[in-house]
Amino acid sequence: MESSKQNNGMTIVAIGSIPLILTLGNSMLIPILPKMKSELHLSQFQVSLVITVFSLIAAFAIPIVGYLADRFSRKVIIIPCLILYGAGGLLAGFAAGFFDNAYPWVMAGRALQGIGAAGTGPIAMALTGDLFKGAQESKVLGLVEASNGMGKVLSPIIGSLIALLVWYGAFFAFPVFCIISIVLTWIFIKEKKKEKEPPPIGQYAKGLLSVFKHEGRWLFTAYLAGATCLFTLFGILFYLSDVLEKTYDTDGVKKGLILAIPLLVMCVTSYTTGSKIGQKQSLMKKLIVLGLAFMTVSYAALSFIENLVLFISVLVLSSIGSGLVLPCVNSFITGAVGKERRGFVTSLYGSVRFLGVAIGPPIFGRLMQWSRPGMFLSIAGLTLVVGILVMMLIHVKQNNEETKEKEDPKMAGNRLQPAEER
């Protein structure tokens, strides 16, 4: 029994290491972007593409990788993707440090990392749904999101520390972390054997169409809520990284620590939320709406705040909001379909999240040039609209009614569940 618990714990550690690697891909580079801009003589738009290209490539690769993960196995996809991720970091690092025309090669390395990233976080979500059930699944998904958040917390600090040695050193850290995750995944993740052969691609596609026909309205709303959190998060980090150096003359480890504050709050909130929500879908919806309301209030208030301490204090409210939204959205989406198509549906969610990350820095870069108050009021408007959409389009039964559904299947019409179970 003790051995089983220990193995279970190491399985969770192994799964958690996968999205942690994923978050390093962008967050670890954010503190060094101003230095990269000056060293490689780049424009603000060019340096923002270092984040955007990685995320865009990942977004388009994820649905393909998700299908392959459903077709074969999660581990068969995750491990090669982690190898590719590390190799892309090596290419970008050598290019930045030793190539004359470094920028195109850095971008090529980031593109390779994007393809590798496609097989990390989203597949880890599907794997969690495969291995854990019920309230334990929600708790582990909360841990996965917390691991994602912890990666965001640690990576600006790690990036800043490595940059004290050499600014492009962060690229060489990627393969080191990837090797650790590969070893953990190989040893501790034991997938269950498939009970039946995967369906032909035509039948698979038909099943997906059925899922989106029945669940599409709320599913895409949930996708949008998750993407909005990541869009605003990375946009704000991009803005804050630039402002800390230019306005407040803050760089190095101190800058990394400041960037880590809102991320740490989001991480703690994500873990707490995931451990409390269980399978209470009505509670999940309320927390998503509350989280988006917190984000709206925070961003609207930031348009009037100049003082750095007060700015970070108010920004923390938006981090609490993101920490409420993301674990609930994860649980909704992971439970939306059965195992056979879970990889694709969670991967599509991963694509949308990556698109949010991809467009955050360039859009915030443009908004920064336009108007600072206008930038914050615009994103406050976005989070408000998304919150209203969640209230209108995601329908769940109350908790006491969910119990009755077990006795009366006719009541299950609007409850979120796999389409194939209907």
From Swiss-Prot:
Alphabetical list of CDD domains matching this protein: MFS_YfmO_like
GO molecular function: transmembrane transporter activity
Chain ranges passing through the membrane: 12-32, 49-69, 76-96, 169-189, 218-238, 257-277, 287-307, 309-329, 344-364, 374-394
Pfam families: MFS_1 (PF07690)
Region (Disordered): 401-422
Basic and acidic residues bias spans: 401-410
RNA-binding as UniProt keyword: no
Family: Belongs to the major facilitator superfamily.
Protein name (database record): Uncharacterized MFS-type transporter YitG
Organism for this UniProt entry: Bacillus subtilis (strain 168)
Gene (name only): yitG
